Amino acid sequence: MKKSVTVGVSVVMLTTCLAAYAQPPHTHRLEATPATVVYGYYWPEAQPVLRIASGDIIDVDTLLTNTPEGLAKAGVPDDEIQPSLKAIVSEVTGERRGPGGHILTGPVYVEGVEPGDVLEVKILSIQPALDYGYNGCKGFLPENCEAGAPAKIIRLDRRHMTAEFAPGIVIPLRPFFGSMGVAPAPELGRLSSNPPGRHAGNLDNRELIAGSTLFIPVFARGALFEVGDGHMAQGDGEVDQTAIETSLRGRLQLTVRKDMKLTWPRAETPTDYISMATDPDLTAATRTAVQEMVDFLVSTRHLTRHQAYQLVSIAGNVAVTQLVDKPNVGVHVRLPRSIFVGR
């Protein structure tokens, strides 16, 4: 009889645990306000604005990288400039500003995440928050830019997800967050939001659209995830330093991955596996990104290094992610998921 009671209690406990495990993730709303953003940096000592459990979802607002004055100079009417942008630029000043130019929503502390883990960021959805974006002109070959010209305002057709650049030139829109990252290694201190790195950050990778998953190595407890720098369309290279920049709303799911160990961020999109790297030297960044893809194939597809390297040459696509986020340029390698059949 005692044995039956013990078994019964064990079954109840197991059922309770399974029921708890099966609970849907909690969804948190995170608006962009002076109290919920950082301005221009990633930092392991930053205070989190939200704490969530691993696997939870955040519905997050992000703001474009500009100022009310800059938008007004470019011709945006005052009633189309977001009040939240006005408040943040006005109130987040002095020591609260870092060396970079991005307004980033966060940091978000993910419970249970430790240095050495990987943060999985599932990009569930991305929507534009405005009917316009802008493009500046600096970057890689600034001699092509007209001196003193204001940013170009580009109206967005949110219904058809297109934008008319000029009469007869229509751009398809593929929104993504230019900056998604975690706190860097402690020895790097308060790191500018401008250059990307091992912590991800300002990757400006046009492939990270809705339906993609970004995997980021973690360097600080809780990860301290930040997101911003919304882009509606961008070419590889981002040669003039800007995309179609705008404010975005996103739904992201953040999960700790203790089963993964990464040196650099990686990603999976609906169509590709992606390795990536950054470095002040383009050749060095390319070398690392290619090697990262080789290592990925060796560990996940059980190929020899010889085979993996050959496969990258046959089926991989090496691209310059961006040339303008000084001091680092970015390179990524895409490998089609469709080549892996019958497994």
Regions found by a protein language model. Give the residues of each.
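Bacterial N-terminal signal peptides
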Residues: 8-19
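Short, Lys/Arg- and Gly-enriched loop/turn segments at beta-strand edges
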Residues: 65-77, 126-136, 222-232, 321-324
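Conserved mixed alpha/beta catalytic, RNA-binding, or beta-rich assembly cores of soluble enzyme
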Residues: 173-283
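Short, basic/aromatic beta-hairpin or loop at an interaction surface
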Residues: 24-38, 79-101, 180-194
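Alpha/propeptide regions of enzymes that mature by internal proteolysis
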Residues: 25-27, 31-37, 45-59, 64, ...
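Intrinsically disordered, low-complexity linker/loop segments enriched in Gly/Pro
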Residues: 99-103, 109, 124-209
